[in-house]
């Protein structure tokens, strides 16, 4: 696949395989749902806020930690509440989903899909993001070139800087935004997203490993994990320096 100029992978190591893997690992949400219902049964922030409100107002005596009630955040909640409660607000009118909080299904799926993309698009973790990096302007209505301080005010070019923004780095941000964006709406805890991303990564690793073991040729997959460490996946019985398709 990588030694003959006029030959490119298709069904086994081509784009079709990448799309196939993305579709399959998207089903990773089955794993967090088992953990949500059968293991942790962890309260949503909104529901936990209900416990705090009932104890703070003397209606119940739940065994909640004293540090919660020593914090000034409760008074801030009371000041901003239109109904004079200590409940945690959510962005959505319907409130939190009715299934348990931990781990986040969105984060799980994001971690799995982003891991597959890193394996295919930036296995070495050093590929510069193609083209110029853009960001929102002050009003948030238009895009402008991003100029990091290390580039002395110049737009970041394609592949001309050693310290460019990498494909892996941007994909990590994508997974983080999907996971932590749920926190912004008030329906998840931070730990739901952090753990969900890592669990999704494990799902993708196991799936890719199973695929490698089923194919006839030796091949290696590698990527930089969310921890920043390189992970190597190799067909059983093959050396780590086996044919690197990427």
Name these PLM-found stretches.
Residues 1-246:
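Hydrophobic alpha-helical bundle signature of multipass membrane enzymes
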């Amino acid at each position: 696949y990588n030694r003959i100029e006029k030959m490119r992978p298709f069904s086994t190591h081509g784009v079709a395989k990448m799309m196939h893997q993305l579709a399959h690992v998207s089903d990773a949400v089955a794993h967090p749902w088992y953990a949500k219902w059968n293991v942790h049964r962890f309260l949503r922030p909104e529901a936990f806020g209900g416990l705090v409100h009932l104890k703070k107002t003397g209606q119940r005596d739940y065994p909640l930690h004293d540090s919660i009630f020593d914090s000034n955040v409760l008074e801030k909640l009371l000041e901003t509440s239109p109904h004079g409660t200590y409940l945690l607000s959510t962005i959505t009118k319907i409130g939190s989903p009715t299934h348990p909080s931990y781990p986040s299904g969105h984060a799980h799926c994001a971690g799995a899909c982003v891991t597959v993309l890193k394996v295919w698009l930036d296995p070495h973790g050093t590929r510069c993001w193609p083209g110029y990096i853009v960001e929102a302007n002050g009003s948030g209505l238009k895009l402008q070139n991003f100029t990091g301080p290390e580039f002395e005010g110049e737009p970041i070019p394609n592949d001309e800087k050693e310290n460019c923004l990498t494909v892996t780095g941007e994909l990590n941000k994508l997974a983080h935004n999907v996971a932590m964006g749920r926190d912004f709406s008030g329906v998840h805890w931070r730990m739901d997203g952090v753990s969900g991303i890592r669990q999704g990564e494990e799902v993708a690793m196991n799936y890719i490993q199973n695929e490698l073991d089923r194919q006839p040729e030796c091949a290696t997959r590698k990527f930089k994990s969310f921890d920043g460490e390189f992970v190597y996946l190799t067909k059983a019985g093959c050396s780590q320096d086996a044919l690197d398709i990427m």
